[in-house]
């Protein structure tokens, strides 16, 4: 999809659908595109004032139940590889830009999930 901002996600009472307004793809590998979708979904959630950590945990569980552990792992690897993003967000945090603070929270969330990734992977291997 490419950018699952909350304003581009609709629910008709039965299914979730994505409104896709984009015409350009930045990642050609499907797993990387899915990983970016996860990152952007969480960033969109964290930028909202109504957001609760339980919502992010529900998204995590939803991805796991749908077999999305590899996508979550890829998202974590992407953020780790591009650690300069987190460093930049931390440096400009004092200005309280909504999107910057949200990205910083996403980076922290993924960093805190490393052990959970290992546990989930072990459970799948059983």
Predicted region positions:
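An alpha-helical support segment within catalytic cores of ATP-dependent transferases
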Residues: 1, 120-123
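Active-site acidic catalytic loop and adjacent metal/ATP-binding pocket
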Residues: 1-28
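C-lobe/activation-segment region of protein kinase-like
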Residues: 22-117
């Amino acid at each position: 999809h490419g950018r699952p901002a909350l304003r581009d996600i609709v629910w008709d009472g039965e299914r979730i659908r994505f409104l896709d307004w984009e015409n350009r793809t930045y990642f050609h590998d499907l797993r990387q595109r899915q990983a970016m979708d996860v990152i952007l979904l969480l960033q969109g959630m964290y930028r909202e004032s109504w957001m609760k950590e339980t919502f992010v945990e529900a998204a995590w569980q939803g991805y796991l139940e749908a077999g999305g552990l590899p996508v979550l792992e890829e998202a974590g690897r992407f953020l780790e590889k591009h650690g300069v993003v987190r460093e930049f967000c931390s440096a400009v945090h004092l200005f309280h830009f909504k999107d910057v603070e949200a990205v910083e929270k996403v980076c922290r969330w993924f960093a805190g999930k490393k052990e959970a990734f290992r546990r989930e992977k072990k459970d799948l291997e059983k």
